[in-house]
Amino acid sequence: MVEGHTDDVPYKTGAVIKDNWDLSVMRATSIVRLITAHKGINPQNITAAGRSQYEPLLPNTNADNRSRNRRTEVIITPDLASIERMLQDISID
């Protein structure tokens, strides 16, 4: 999963981006497009999500913190069925 994040400053409404929700989704989808186009990742195996301003790393109390909150995160989730099979194989040995 790729998550896009923003700070809490309202986005100035534009023709394409309406608010921080749109901006966070666009951040995530731009990374997803790069990964699927250039790294051979199957688009069925990746998700883009926008978190807007609602999961800040730091309080949005100054410019430096707001800058750190404007980010994109790549979250790698394991295939749980594969892990379960590996654990079963270990317990059998």
Residues of each region from the PLM?
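Periplasmic OmpA-like peptidoglycan-binding domain that tethers envelope proteins to the cell wall
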Residues: H5-D93
